[in-house]
Amino acid sequence: MVKSYTRYEPTEFFGVIASSGCNILGQPSSSAKSVGRAIVGGLESVLEWDLKTGQLLSKWKDSDCSAKVTCIANFDEMYAVGYADGSIRLWKDGELLITLNGHKSAVTTMDFDKMGTRLASGSMDTDIIVWDIVAETGLFRLRGHKDQITKLLFITPPSKNTAEETVVDTDIDSGDMDVDSKSSDSFLLSVGKDSFMKLWDLSIQHCVETHVDHQGEIWAMCVSPDAKRCLTAGTGSDVKVWEISFPDDNNFTPTTKAFQQLGTFTRQSRDRPITLAYDVSNRYVVFQAHDRLLEVFRLRSSAELEKILNRRRRRKKSEDVSITLKDEYEPFALIRTTARASSVAWIPGNRTPTLVTSLQNNSIEVYALDVKSEGSAAPLTERASRISAIEIPGHRADVRTLALSANHDVILSGANGSLKLWNKKTTSCIRTIECGYVLAASFINNDKCIVSAYKSGELEVYDIASSSLIERIQAHDGAIWDLAVGHDGTYFATASADHTVKLWSLKSSFDFVPGTTRKVTTLKLEQTRQIDFTDDVLAVKISPDGRFVAASLLDNTVKVYYLDSLKFFLNLYGHKLPVLSMDISYDSKLLVTCSADKNVKIWGLDFGDCHKSIFAHQDSIMEVTFQPDTYNFFTCSKDREVRYWDGKSFDLILKLRGHHSEVWALAVGPTFVVSGSHDHSIRLWEQGDDLVFLEEERERELEEQYESTLVSSYENAEADGEVKDGDVAAVTKQTIESLKDGEKILEAITIGIEDLDQEIQYRLDLLKSPGKARGPRNPILAHLGVSAEEYVLNTFKKIRSSHLDDALLVLPFEHVLSLFRFIDIWASRKWSIPLVSRIIFFLLRTYHRQLTTTVKMRPLLNNIRSSLRGSLQEERSLIGYNAAGLSYLRHEWELTHNTSLEDIDSTSLEVDGKKRAFSNIV
């Protein structure tokens, strides 16, 4: 009989407040009492935090994506999220709208245009892609940078800021419609690590300006809200200031530049910048570098600059004076965060300018500027104050140890600086204890206390109910690497770098309350015995039956002793590097060890024989733990995986993937597994309803490997066939979803062509022999009761718009020719003209040379052209009619709702003695 296992599935991860590799967004809150909201990346999820209460409002995660979030941009409440695999997902109200694939590596920067209909994205693959959000497809790919894109922004010429957003001239009778494309963001500004600053004209899809004024990488850029100034910062402390001045069409010459460098001013920090950002009022600009310093500059008003100019004229008694950039940008505040900053953003909507910053130690801080200190002599470091922070829901450092309570409802985690207790059901932090560098911790005394071991050699015992320290002792002269609790929870063993294993027990004692005669019961740690070794002890374990104690040494061996007499029993050797962790089975018959040599060895405790040696991981194995009451065990490694093994057959059952960094710790319950990682996350894996069969699991892994190889082969083939010359290219990227969609189209065309040919042959046979019955149709078409052309069109309609172009690239050319037969039918019957037009235009662009040399396609293409021209004219007329109607409704609404200030009659105010009320003032 084939043995089956229960599948472990990822259910939740917690402990992450903000990932260091993603920017942060500040958003206003609906509550007047709240400071605002923060939108940050949390590994593969997007987290929304309330900055006042520290509550996690929502978590957005696509179950099909395991890549890390690298970039976030927003248009109002619609968020574009870029991932490390190059994909982009659009979210609104916590729901996934669309997925866009085009980049071949991590997305580094994104920006929406002012209408929110286009999105520009830059990546580590040096490409810029402009996306059409409405059509859910990529418009074009811009090439020109030679290294990673660090920042890009849509630019609207300042002269057009006050113009109407959209100008529509409509001729209802003819259906002509002209939309002024220049009214929208028609320029794109980009900077990269190649030291280039490029200005792209999106109307012609070409780079019109390139500036190479920086000596090295350009790490940050921002544009003022009025689009008149641009700031760029590179590797040094200098900030370059650019004036944005787009020439009119009449004054345009080939040598005219829209960006003119005005000069530089200096930041205080010497580290490379990460973020530059203007606030919405255009009064302040913040500079964030790769350190703990945030610098805020204030932009002086024209009146202040005029005072400075007059003062200089009086001092020099000359008119030959001018304003410098140092005069315009005044250092206003210096903010020193508690750790290195990852990103910073302004929070709009607050009365005082407020900054939110994510830190590299997995926390978020909020600072408010003291605007009353403008013009005062207050120190720069005292002009901003921290008003809130989010620190409790996560550790400041990587998770080094995990433990479970006896009832498996509470999870204990330890890191450098803190111990935390988590509710397993709600994944909320219920206790936080400040401490030192924790290397091991566990529950003792019937889950009433916690014992923790530190790198300094200290042992501490805490009372859980009060979170108070009961006792602290210097237990060892070196770091305590491991801690093992006995079967009844009243004693434990510690393994240290001072070459000893010490056994400890909890003793109750009575102490007098100072100043009184009352006695209180306290717990004390008492060392009972000690085992001396010649090398550092890295791990220790006590058998469940209380008979043995095992210790792993730096000399790659494991020594087993009788616990009662501490007499030597077994010496286990075979590992090539030190054993980092070990565990003993529930019946005390098996010992499993894991080592830095990437191997797991299973030993018998009867005679000390090695049952099996398994090459288990691709990197050092950090911990191994048996599943309760079974011989199955789990391992975790620096290769970011948790693996599930059968200790009897020595087979690999499951690979649990999800962590983005080294996995340091494991805790195994009866039906779940908890893992802690260097990425600050604690992940929970629980048993599901699915069963795992080893053969099926291996086949599934091989299929995943084949699919990934297939996708990479398509990408390599496309890369070999791409023309690298030129600034513009098509937006294509094959994914496994697009390949599957292409196979669906291929299958539908094959079935449809057979049915069409059968129909033609049947009509020819009717001419020869009237009354002849038609042969059986394809079972799929017969079951659905549709014609071949309807079936193929329905297949296209089911494909995502973002996958359509990539799916069409999968088709062989002979199937493309067959597809044109269906396009001819669809165009003549006026079915789904927008979809049909998109398909035919893409095929004509892709296979233009082949189609023009195929003689038999000429009549078919002529038929399609004549049919499609009339249909497109009707669609154009319909759009023009609707646009005219919307323009009329907008005009009527403005007449009834908008009132200008010139309508106010001052004489009527004097007579009536009261102000006139207005519904809205624009």
Curated annotation (Swiss-Prot):
Coiled coil: none annotated. SMART domains: WD40. GO terms for cellular component: cytosol; nucleus; Pwp2p-containing subcomplex of 90S preribosome; small-subunit processome. The modification Phosphoserine is found at S769. It comes from the Eukaryota. InterPro entries: G-protein_beta_WD-40_rep, SSU_processome_Utp12, TBC1_cilium_biogenesis, WD40/YVTN_repeat-like_dom_sf, WD40_repeat_CS, WD40_repeat_dom_sf, WD40_rpt. The keyword Nucleus does not apply. WD repeats lie at residues 63-101, 102-141, 169-210, 213-252, 268-307, 336-377, 394-432, 434-472, 475-514, 532-571, 574-615, 616-655, 658-695. Pfam families: Beta-prop_WDR3_1st, Beta-prop_WDR3_2nd, Utp12. GO terms for biological process: maturation of SSU-rRNA. One of its GO terms (molecular function) is snoRNA binding. Keywords: Phosphoprotein, Repeat, WD repeat. The keyword Repeat applies. PROSITE patterns: WD_REPEATS_1 (PS00678), WD_REPEATS_2 (PS50082), WD_REPEATS_REGION (PS50294). PANTHER family: WD REPEAT CONTAINING PROTEIN 3 WDR3, WD REPEAT-CONTAINING PROTEIN 3. Belongs to the WD repeat WDR3/UTP12 family. This is Uncharacterized WD repeat-containing protein C3D6.12. It comes from Schizosaccharomyces pombe (strain 972 / ATCC 24843) (Fission yeast).
